[in-house]
A protein has these predicted regions:
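Short loop/turn motifs at secondary-structure junctions and domain boundaries
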Residues: 33-34, 60-63
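Blade-loop segments of beta-propeller domains
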Residues: 62-69, 75-104
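Beta-propeller blade signature
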Residues: 68-72, 129-138
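Residues embedded in well-ordered secondary-structure elements
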Residues: 18, 31, 58, 90-91, ...
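Hydrophobic core segments of beta-strands in well-ordered, beta-rich domains
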Residues: 38-58, 81-83, 98-124, 130-135
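N-terminal regions that are enriched for targeting/export leaders
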Residues: 1-50, 55
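Conserved small/polar residues in nucleotide/adenosyl-binding loops
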Residues: 140-142
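Short, ordered coil/turn segments that flank beta-strands lining enzyme active or ligand-binding pockets
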Residues: 45-47, 73-76
Length: 142
């Protein structure tokens, strides 16, 4: 696991412990902390329904996208799992954007858009999107 993903998971744990459960919705997925947007990777794996989503754990405003992760068996009660992806590689250091999830050869596989920023000759920056894949129990990048 990368340092950035480990840092995000530690931050989530701290924020969950400090959050009054009564402030969280009963029947909807919500991020443990920070900003949440685009749902991704809605999938069935290992007997559970998984929902991944883009989110920025460190602020309630848009920022470098991570992928949050929740599971359910009944589509009513959702369990928050640790972050699945963090922008921690050269090919996704500006964010882990939209993607999908499948089961392949018994593994949960995430395919997502990694974003990098490329400096242009005039000094401006341009986003470059890359197709990325993560797989396995801890969703290790390849």
């Amino acid at each position: 696991m990368s340092n950035m993903l480990e840092k995000a998971r530690k931050y989530e744990t701290e924020k969950i412990a400090a959050t009054d459960p009564q402030t969280k919705p009963l029947f909807h997925v919500s991020a443990p902390t920070g900003w949440i947007n685009d749902p991704n990777g809605f999938s069935f794996y290992d007997g559970q329904i998984h929902l991944f989503y883009q989110y920025h754990p460190y602020n309630r405003e848009w920022g470098p996208m991570h992928w949050g992760h929740s599971v359910t068996c009944d589509m009513i009660q959702w369990e928050q799992l640790p972050a699945a992806l963090a922008p921690d590689e050269e090919y996704d250091k500006a964010g882990c954007f939209s993607g999908s999830a499948i089961e392949a050869d018994g593994k949960h596989v995430l395919v997502y858009t990694g974003v990098t920023r490329i400096k242009q000759p005039d000094g401006s920056e341009q986003d470059r999107q890359n197709q990325c894949i993560a797989f396995g129990l801890s969703l290790i990048h390849i």
